[in-house]
């Protein structure tokens, strides 16, 4: 008897955040598909789920326009290698996880070969470079969005889209507790803690590290009782941050931990972070925060004129109003950031902010992995098992 060939699902995650999303979707799909293969580009979490990565995820890591331009020949060769593989052995569906500039070009080529394409995590077309929506319409059979306003945007432009919620909203409890976590990091219940997250890439640490260190120095002078905890995403970033720290700020008392950014935020009273997923996590953990971000000069010159939204921090975007202070580029200066952090540290009542964070959390809590898997199965035309 001839064995039915396995369902082939190709995926590309270009960053570790996409690796986490991909792992959750793979885990859920395996509940419905007993004979399935996953291949493409993924990180350690996807590999744990049985994913076969043709290329190491680190080879796709870029930060800013200048890095993309410098690495373009390498990225081009990687893309062509993947497309050759999938031309010879076509997958039943391709799922691009975030990483839009790379994945959309792959999706466009595969769709011309009549391969179903899904994009998980909307490119920020609602924020900048809105003309990309026309490329997305041609390249993608379905966009799976993590936020409700994204689904509405795509449908207005005739693109098939579905809001699935955010996996982090499913993972983090509505009313998180951190009392036992404080003991893990040798803090007391009455200690005042500021969690500082300068970024998860070398380029981000390069711009945000010195700025946030200077803010910590100011706060240490004005509020000597405040404790600082800085999670560093991976070992590769340690030399970069330690060089900045010991250049001028070696006297600062900072607890530096590897990974565990969520725990660092959970035990804190206030979070200081660059923009990005960390702002969402801080909101889901119900932590007051200050958000800042700086680009390189070239990246800022290209991107800034195309930005179409009033905010960069996800809590503000999701609320449709300014819930938390945010500072971008020239406004991301030591004086402004320090003042905002001190105001939050001195505030004794954040009940209204926490209520609004909770309302958004409930909206995003949709069992995202299951919704994504069911949408993928519908595209595949596979009956549920």
Curated annotation (Swiss-Prot):
GO terms for cellular component: membrane. It catalyses: a lipid X + a UDP-2-N,3-O-bis[(3R)-3-hydroxyacyl]-alpha-D-glucosamine = a lipid A disaccharide + UDP + H(+). Pathway: Bacterial outer membrane biogenesis; LPS lipid A biosynthesis. It is an enzyme of class 2 (transferase). Signal peptide: none annotated. Keywords: Glycosyltransferase, Lipid A biosynthesis, Lipid biosynthesis, Lipid metabolism, Transferase. One of its GO terms (molecular function) is lipid-A-disaccharide synthase activity. Its EC number is 2.4.1.182. Condensation of UDP-2,3-diacylglucosamine and 2,3-diacylglucosamine-1-phosphate to form lipid A disaccharide, a precursor of lipid A, a phosphorylated glycolipid that anchors the lipopolysaccharide to the outer membrane of the cell. HAMAP family: LpxB. Belongs to the LpxB family. This is Lipid-A-disaccharide synthase 2.
């Amino acid at each position: 008897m001839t064995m039915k060939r396995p369902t082939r699902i190709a995926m590309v995650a270009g960053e570790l955040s996409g690796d986490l999303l991909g792992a959750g979707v793979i885990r859920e799909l395996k509940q419905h598909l007993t004979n399935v293969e996953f291949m493409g580009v993924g990180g350690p979490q996807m590999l744990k789920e049985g994913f076969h990565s043709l290329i190491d995820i680190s080879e796709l890591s870029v930060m800013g326009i200048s890095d993309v331009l410098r690495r373009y020949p390498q990225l081009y060769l990687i893309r062509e290698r993947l497309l050759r593989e999938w031309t010879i052995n076509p997958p039943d569906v391709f799922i691009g996880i975030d990483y839009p500039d790379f994945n959309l070009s792959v999706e466009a080529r595969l769709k011309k070969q009549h391969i179903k394409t899904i994009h998980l995590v909307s490119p920020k077309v609602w924020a900048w470079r809105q003309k990309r929506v026309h490329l997305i319409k041609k390249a993608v059979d379905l966009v799976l969005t993590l936020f409700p306003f994204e689904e509405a945007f795509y449908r207005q432009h005739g693109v098939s889209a579905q809001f699935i919620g955010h996996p982090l909203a499913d993972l983090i409890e509505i009313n998180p507790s951190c009392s036992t976590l404080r003991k893990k990091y040798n803090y007391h219940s009455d200690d005042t803690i500021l969690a500082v997250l300068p970024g998860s890439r070398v380029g981000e640490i390069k711009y945000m590290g010195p700025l946030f260190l200077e803010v910590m120095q100011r706060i240490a002078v004005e509020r000597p009782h405040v404790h600082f905890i800085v999670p560093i995403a991976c070992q590769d970033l340690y030399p970069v941050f330690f060089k900045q720290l010991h250049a001028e700020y070696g006297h600062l008392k900072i607890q530096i931990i590897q990974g565990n950014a969520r725990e660092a935020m959970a035990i804190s009273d206030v979070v200081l972070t660059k923009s990005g997923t960390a702002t969402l996590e801080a909101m889901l953990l119900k932590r007051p925060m200050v958000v800042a971000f700086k680009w390189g000069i070239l990246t800022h010159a290209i991107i800034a004129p195309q930005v179409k939204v009033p905010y960069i921090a996800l809590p503000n975007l999701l609320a449709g109003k300014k819930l938390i202070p945010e500072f971008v580029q020239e406004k991301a200066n030591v004086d402004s950031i320090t003042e905002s952090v001190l105001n939050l540290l001195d505030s004794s009542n954040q009940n209204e902010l926490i209520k609004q964070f909770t309302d958004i959390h409930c909206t995003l809590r949709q069992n995202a992995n299951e919704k994504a898997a069911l949408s993928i199965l519908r595209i595949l035309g596979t009956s549920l098992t």
